[in-house]
Regions:
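Active-site entrance/lid segments in N-terminal catalytic domains of soluble metabolic enzymes
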Residues: 1-206, 234-239
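Alpha/beta catalytic cores of nucleotide-metabolism and tRNA/nucleoside-modifying enzymes
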Residues: 1-21, 95, 163, 185-209, ...
């Protein structure tokens, strides 16, 4: 075993203030995930089946970010969700897996003028991920940005960079309803993961911090650690635009929120993300996520406004 190193997550640090002449209204939150994909805000909605379908993707895109349509859908259903977003002339992404059958999904997605394809797995430093990346690169348009993940080390970053992806997604187990670190004992605290992955990136490849964002200040910390954008799940879940019905319980309103490694999500199709697709007996799934109720929050635009407002407040103190 390698020597144990100290590792940090967002809660372990704060950012030191700097001399600044910048006002919040003067701050630019624009970012590029590739030469083809520019965002007005550095926010992506997570490819989770209780977070992003067309309604969420449309709302996030209108605010300047991009939503990634989850893959716990049939190919036809996912294409339908993508078309709803593209019909509004908005940017949208779509998640794909690594199973051999997933390439058929990819072939249909690339016909939709998709802006972003995300190879969405729990372990991006693997041969299956490499295989699907090489296949996607052969058929995708130059206009489509290719992202792969998730990883947490510089070695994994070098691996994906050599394969020619545009963006790398970082995060092994930081999500609020992900239990990978408990079940498998695997993971790297998110801030340290970002700093390490950054060492393995070449200058052209961008980085997304995926998971662990609980406050707007965490976005600022992720960007300070080298991320070009963040992917958010729990903070956007429970909003009007998130999939699922509103549930009333003891006079309060809720929506269902679950990890893609939960039993419910794996039963719907995400078992492939955790390399358990070949397990025919669903009772033998080893879940790496949980499911529960999350407070209903209303329109997602209000949440995004608070997140970007907090980011601007941080940048006014840090930007010279």
């Amino acid at each position: 075993m390698d020597p144990i190193k100290e590792a940090l997550t967002f809660d372990d640090v704060t950012l030191a203030p700097q001399y600044s002449k910048v006002l919040p209204s003067e701050v630019s939150t624009k970012t590029y995930l590739s030469n083809q994909l520019k965002l007005d805000i550095p926010i992506l909605s997570s490819a989770m089946d209780t977070v992003t379908e067309s309604k969420m993707a449309i709302a996030v895109a209108r605010e300047g970010g991009i939503g990634v349509i989850h893959r716990n859908l049939t190919i036809a259903q996912q294409i339908s969700e993508i078309k709803k977003v593209k019909s509004k002339n908005l940017k949208v992404g779509a998640a794909v897996g690594t199973n051999e059958s997933e390439f058929n999904r990819v072939k249909n997605i690339v016909k939709q003028d998709i802006d972003l394809i995300v190879v969405d797995t729990a372990h991006g430093h693997s041969q299956k991920v490499a295989d699907i990346i090489l296949k996607i690169k052969k058929i995708k348009s130059k206009k489509t940005t290719l992202c792969a993940g998730n990883i947490a080390t510089a070695e994994a970053a070098r691996f994906l960079c050599k394969l020619g992806v545009d963006v790398i997604k970082v995060g092994i187990g930081p999500g609020s309803i992900c239990t990978t670190r408990l079940v498998a004992g695997i993971g790297v605290p998110q801030l340290s993961a970002l700093l390490d992955v950054k060492k393995g990136l070449n200058k052209k490849v961008k980085m997304i911090s995926d998971g662990g964002i609980k406050f707007s200040g965490d976005i600022a910390k992720a960007l300070a650690a080298g991320a070009d954008a963040v992917m958010i799940g729990s903070m956007l879940a429970g909003t009007s635009e998130a999939p699922g019905k509103i549930i009333k319980k003891k006079g309060k309103l809720f929506k269902i929120f679950r990890g893609m490694g939960s039993v419910g999500a794996m039963n719907k199709g995400s078992a492939d993300r955790y390399f358990q697709k070949k397990q025919k007996d669903k009772s033998k799934y080893v879940p790496e996520g949980v499911e529960g109720l999350i407070k209903y929050k209303g329109d997602v635009s209000k949440t995004i406004h608070k997140l970007t407002g907090g980011l601007r407040s941080s940048m006014k103190i840090l930007v010279r």
